[in-house]
C-alpha cells in the first residue's frame, strides 16, 4: 500500500493504533465546546444525553414559553391537551440525528458506548456502539455507516456500476475512508489498481483503530490511499485512465458539497475511459427530489453515454432509502439495468475469498431501477 498525504498537517498514521495527540483522548474530545467523557456540555446545556436548553427542556418535559409543562400543551383558549407518553420521549443515552436536509424528523439510536468523539479539520467525527446496528459512524451529526445495517448501501454502490461493465481493472473511490467500499471492491479478481481519496485523515485513523479488518485492506498492493481533496484529485487525473469511479460521499453540505456540482462531474467524465462508469450517492426520493433533479440535470449535460437513477433500502438512513446516480461516458454501450458482470451470492466465494454477499444479487440490481410513479415522472421529465 502507498499512502500519500496532501493535507496541510501531513499526518494520518499514528503509532500503535493511538489517536494523534491533537486533542483526541480516550475516545473523547475536549474542544472549546466542552465535549468531555462522552458528554456534551455546550452553551445550550446538553449534558448526559439530556437537553436542558434555555427554552426549558428538562428530564423529558418541556417548559416553553408557550406553556408546555409536565406533558401538557396549554392553548390560548385555556384548554389543555395531554401529551401521551411524553415522559419517555426524551431519554439519556440516545443519539438523535437532526439535519436541515430532513427537517421535521429525526432518527434515534440507543448508545451502548461512545467509542470516539472528535473534531477534524473538516467536520465533527463520532463513533459509538449502538444497541441495534453495532458500530455507528457519524459526520457532523449525520449517520454515515453502521456496521450491521450499512451493507445494502455499500454493496449497491460498488456492484451496481462494476456489475455493469466487463472486466473492471482501474477504479477510483472518492471518500470511503473507513474501508467498507474497498472491502466490497476486492471481490473482483480483474481489478489491478484502486485509488482511494479521502479528505479527512481522522476518518482513516478511526478505521485503523476501530475497524482493523477493513483498514488492513489499505495494505493491499493494488491499493493507493491518498489523503486529500477528491475533487482536486479527479481534476488532475490522467484523461481516460479509470474504468469506474465510485463517489462514496456524505451529503451535499460541508466538505462534500463540490462532489455534487457540474465541474466535478466534468472532471469525472474526463478521467473515465470511453464507456467508463461512475456511481455516486444521490440522496432520498422522499426528501430530496429538488437535489436529485439538479444532479440529473448536471449529469445529462456531461455524460453522453447513459444516465440512470437507482435506489435501495438502508434502515439507518433518512426515510430508510438512498439513491444512486449511475452514468457512463460515450463509447461502448452500458446497460446499467441488466448486469453483464454480476457478482452474485452463488459465485462470490468462487471469485474471491470474502464472505458471501448479504444484500446484492442480480434481481435486486435490476429492481433498483424501478421507481415509484411520482419519482419516475419527475426524474424522466
Swiss-Prot record:
List, from the UniProt record, the residues annotated as the active site of this protein. 248 (proton acceptor)
Q: Does the keyword Nucleotide-binding apply?
A: no
As annotated in Swiss-Prot or TrEMBL, what is the tissue specificity of this protein? Predominantly expressed in roots.
Question: Disruption effect?
Answer: Plants suppressed for PMT1, PMT2, PMT3 and PMT4 exhibit strongly reduced nicotine levels but accumulate polyamines in roots, and have an impaired leaf maturation phenotype at harvest.
Upregulation: Accumulates upon the removal of flower heads and young leaves. Triggered by jasmonic acid (MeJA).
| A molecular-function term among this protein's GO annotations | spermidine synthase activity
For the ligand (S-adenosyl-L-methionine), the binding residues are: 123, 198, 229-230, 317
Which segments show compositional bias classed as Polar residues?
A: 23-39, 46-81
- Name the GO terms of the biological process aspect: alkaloid metabolic process; methylation; nicotine biosynthetic process; putrescine biosynthetic process; response to jasmonic acid; spermidine biosynthetic process
Pathway given in the UniProt record: Alkaloid biosynthesis; nicotine biosynthesis
- Cellular-component GO terms for this entry: cytosol
- Which HAMAP family does the UniProt entry name for this protein? Spermidine_synth
- What functional role does this protein have? Involved in the biosynthesis of pyridine alkaloid natural products, leading mainly to the production of anabasine, anatabine, nicotine and nornicotine, effective deterrents against herbivores with antiparasitic and pesticide properties (neurotoxins); nornicotine serves as the precursor in the synthesis of the carcinogen compound N'-nitrosonornicotine (NNN). Methyltransferase that mediates the conversion of putrescine to N-methylputrescine. Promotes leaves ripening.
Question: Would you identify the family this protein belongs to, as annotated?
Answer: Belongs to the class I-like SAM-binding methyltransferase superfamily. Putrescine methyltransferase family.
The record ties this protein, via PANTHER family, to:
PUTRESCINE N-METHYLTRANSFERASE 1, SPERMIDINE/SPERMINE SYNTHASE
Q: What is the name of this protein?
A: Putrescine N-methyltransferase 3
Organism name = Nicotiana tabacum (Common tobacco)
Q: Which gene encodes it?
A: PMT3
Amino acid at each position: 500500500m502507498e499512502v500519500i498525504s496532501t493535507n496541510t498537517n501531513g499526518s494520518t498514521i499514528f503509532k500503535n493504533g493511538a489517536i494523534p495527540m491533537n486533542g483526541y483522548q480516550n475516545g473523547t474530545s475536549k474542544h472549546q465546546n466542552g465535549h468531555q467523557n462522552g458528554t456534551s456540555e455546550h452553551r445550550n446545556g446538553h449534558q448526559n444525553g439530556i437537553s436542558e436548553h434555555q427554552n426549558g427542556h428538562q428530564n423529558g418535559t418541556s417548559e416553553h414559553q408557550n406553556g408546555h409543562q409536565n406533558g401538557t400543551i396549554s392553548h390560548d383558549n385555556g384548554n389543555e391537551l395531554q401529551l401521551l407518553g411524553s415522559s419517555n420521549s426524551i431519554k439519556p443515552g440516545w443519539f438523535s440525528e437532526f439535519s436541515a436536509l430532513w427537517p421535521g424528523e429525526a432518527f434515534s439510536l440507543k448508545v451502548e458506548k461512545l467509542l470516539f468523539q472528535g473534531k477534524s479539520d473538516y467536520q465533527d467525527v463520532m463513533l459509538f456502539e449502538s444497541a441495534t446496528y453495532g458500530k455507528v459512524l457519524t459526520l457532523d451529526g449525520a449517520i454515515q455507516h453502521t456496521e450491521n445495517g450499512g451493507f445494502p448501501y455499500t454493496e449497491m454502490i460498488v456492484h451496481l456500476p462494476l456489475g455493469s461493465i466487463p472486466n473492471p481493472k482501474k477504479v477510483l473511490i472518492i471518500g470511503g475512508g473507513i474501508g467498507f467500499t474497498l472491502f466490497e471492491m476486492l471481490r473482483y479478481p480483474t481489478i489491478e489498481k484502486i485509488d482511494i481519496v479521502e479528505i479527512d485523515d481522522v476518518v482513516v485513523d478511526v478505521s485503523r483503530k476501530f475497524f482493523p479488518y477493513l483498514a488492513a485492506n489499505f495494505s493491499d498492493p493494488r491499493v493507493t490511499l491518498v489523503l486529500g481533496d477528491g475533487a482536486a484529485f479527479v481534476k488532475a487525473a490522467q484523461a481516460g485512465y479509470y474504468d469506474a469511479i465510485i463517489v462514496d460521499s456524505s451529503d451535499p453540505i460541508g466538505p462534500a458539497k463540490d462532489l455534487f456540482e457540474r465541474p466535478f462531474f466534468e472532471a469525472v467524465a474526463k478521467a473515465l475511459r470511453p464507456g467508463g462508469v461512475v456511481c455516486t450517492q444521490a440522496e432520498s426520493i422522499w426528501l430530496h427530489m429538488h437535489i436529485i433533479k439538479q444532479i440529473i440535470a448536471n449529469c445529462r449535460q456531461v455524460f453522453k453515454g447513459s444516465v440512470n437513477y437507482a435506489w435501495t433500502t438502508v434502515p439507518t438512513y433518512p426515510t430508510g432509502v438512498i439513491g444512486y446516480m449511475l452514468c457512463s461516458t460515450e463509447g461502448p454501450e452500458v446497460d446499467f439495468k441488466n448486469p453483464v458482470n454480476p457478482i452474485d451470492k452463488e459465485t462470490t466465494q468462487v471469485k474471491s475469498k470474502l464472505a458471501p454477499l448479504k444484500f446484492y444479487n442480480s434481481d435486486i440490481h435490476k429492481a433498483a431501477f424501478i421507481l415509484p410513479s411520482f419519482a419516475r415522472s419527475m426524474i424522466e421529465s
